[in-house]
Curated annotation (Swiss-Prot):
This is RAC-alpha serine/threonine-protein kinase. Belongs to the protein kinase superfamily. AGC Ser/Thr protein kinase family. RAC subfamily. It comes from Bos taurus. AKT1 is one of 3 closely related serine/threonine-protein kinases (AKT1, AKT2 and AKT3) called the AKT kinase, and which regulate many processes including metabolism, proliferation, cell survival, growth and angiogenesis. This is mediated through serine and/or threonine phosphorylation of a range of downstream substrates. Over 100 substrate candidates have been reported so far, but for most of them, no isoform specificity has been reported. The modification Phosphoserine is found at residues 124, 129, 473, 477. Binding of the PH domain to phosphatidylinositol 3,4,5-trisphosphate (PI(3,4,5)P3) following phosphatidylinositol 3-kinase alpha (PIK3CA) activity results in its targeting to the plasma membrane. PI(3,4,5)P3 is also required for phosphorylation at Thr-308 and subsequent activation. The PH domain mediates interaction with TNK2 and Tyr-176 is also essential for this interaction. The AGC-kinase C-terminal mediates interaction with THEM4. It is an enzyme of class 2 (transferase). PANTHER family: RIBOSOMAL PROTEIN S6 KINASE. The gene is AKT1.
Length: 480
């Protein structure tokens, strides 16, 4: 019954996600939903264990189209925490029909199995998934937090999905950053899973260089994260002003980032995946705070890989562009890019034309300013290796390999974690409402928030059961 059998196999043309070329891939569809692709037809078991593409057709939607090529079909499914789309084409309508029928049959079979398992498990809470266990075990806040519990002081930032506002909690007088996301935009842009991931990761993470979550709650049309407020500003803001950081300053920030990523990888089995200067903040004392967990992957162990696309183009690792499976090493590529920016004052690869940019990331050798020390060059060369298996931190030792690099020879890692190192720059903030390190384009704006509806003042059972955002509410004090 548990034997995994191949349902269908053969050649398909697969379209790249970023570099929109069609690549021939030999795909195997298995009855457990696995849909794996290879450059060549695998001849033995060893070759089968290293696929280039690894998808699941569970809960998928299939669409047939004649664009951009005849006999195209698109698979859309939720994978890990993100909705993904993969585009394939074959030579004839008959071939397409065979593939789509086989995929739909496997997906339907898995759905039936899941429904049977759910029936069998009802009344047995110990069998639930980790995410469900976590949500059930969260203590509910005694007082339901709502938008009326805060004063709205200044706009700190604005994006596609919503805004970030400096708020003051009326009951305690404490200051927080409130991230307010519009549900309709999140749903329209397939960001539901990313957003729920951010909520889960923030709830479960306790580390000095990760932004702490105080509360999360929802209204009928918004999701709200009330987070620790780091008013030292974005690292991007400071680097833009100073153009380049000294190696000592870059080493300090780099060490704190490595400490946080090590915690996420080893303690939480999470890959951050979106490391960039804009997601690195400074607190009032000048220590790093990593923000914005919307692109995190959950459940990544050593050797585990993932298949979804997101991230800023300039920071994308080669294995992501190549449309290959990727794992924790993407974070070390991201670290390489941000540390290169800090020490060299520019991105390692840049072109306004995305196709040319991707070509540079995949093919171009890294270049360094003459002023860079041999240790810094060695570190950056290791972190920016194109092959993730050869990359510094790409092996089973993960962060430990980077910690042992000679660039960090002077660093005592326990002292980093305990914040015993003096920050090389202390933000000159005079109060908690001082926003001098935030862009005036935002802070000078009037805050406009549509008043919550009457029924939003109490987040009732119905809102908690909404299909897109179940069990969203959280209070750190209730779980402390």
């Amino acid at each position: 019954m548990n034997d995994v059998a191949i349902v269908k196999e053969g050649w398909l043309h697969k379209r790249g996600e970023y570099i929109k070329t069609w690549r021939p891939r030999y795909f195997l569809l298995k009855n457990d939903g696995t849909f794996i692709g290879y450059k060549e037809r695998p001849q033995d078991l060893e070759q089968r264990e290293s696929p280039l593409n690894n998808f699941s057709v569970a809960q998928c939607q299939l669409m047939k189209t004649e664009r951009p090529r005849p006999n195209t079909f698109i698979i859309r499914c939720l994978q890990w925490t993100t909705v993904i789309e993969r585009t394939f084409h074959v030579e004839t309508p008959e071939e397409r029909e065979e593939w789509t029928t086989a995929i739909q049959t496997v997906a339907d079979g898995l759905k039936r199995q899941e429904e049977e398992t759910m029936d069998f498990r009802s009344g047995s809470p110990g069998e639930n998934s980790g995410a469900e266990e976590m949500e059930v075990s969260l203590a509910k806040p005694k007082h339901r937090v709502t938008m009326n519990d805060f004063e709205y002081l200044k706009l700190l930032g604005k994006g596609t999905f919503g805004k970030v506002i400096l708020v003051k909690e009326k009951a305690t007088g404490r200051y927080y950053a409130m991230k307010i996301l519009k549900k309709e935009v999140i749903v329209a842009k397939d960001e539901v899973a990313h957003t729920l991931t951010e909520n889960r990761v923030l709830q479960n993470s306790r580390h000095p260089f990760l932004t702490a979550l105080k509360y999360s709650f929802q209204t009928h049309d918004r999701l709200c994260f009330v987070m620790e407020y780091a008013n030292g500003g974005e690292l991007f803001f400071h680097l833009s002003r100073e153009r380049v950081f000294s190696e000592d300053r870059a080493r300090f920030y780099g060490a704190e980032i490595v400490s946080a990523l090590d915690y996420l990888h080893s303690e939480k089995e999470v890959v951050y995946r979106d490391l960039k200067l804009e997601n690195l903040m400074l607190d009032k004392d000048g220590h790093i705070k990593i923000t914005d967990f919307g692109l995190c992957k959950e459940g990544i162990k050593d050797g585990a890989t993932m298949k979804t696309f997101c991230g800023t183009p300039e920071y994308l690792a080669p294995e992501v562009l190549e449309d290959n499976d990727y794992g924790r090493a993407v974070d070390w590529w991201g670290l390489g890019v941000v540390m290169y920016e800090m020490m060299c004052g520019r991105l390692p690869f840049y072109n306004q034309d995305h196709e040319k940019l991707f070509e540079l990331i995949l093919m171009e050798e890294i270049r360094f300013p003459r002023t860079l020390s041999p240790e810094a060059k060695s570190l950056l060369s290791g972190l920016l290796k194109k092959d993730p298996k050869q990359r510094l931190g790409g092996g089973s030792e993960d962060a430990k390999e980077i910690m042992q690099h000679r660039f960090f020879a002077s660093i005592v890692w326990q002292d980093v974690y305990e914040k015993k190192l003096s920050p090389p720059f202390k933000p000159q903030v005079t109060s908690e409402t001082d926003t001098r390190y935030f862009d005036e384009e935002f802070t000078a704006q009037m805050i406009t928030i549509t008043p919550p509806d009457q029924d939003d003042s109490m987040e009732g059972v119905d809102s908690e059961r909404r299909p897109h955002f179940p069990q969203f509410s959280y209070s750190a004090s209730a779980t402390a």
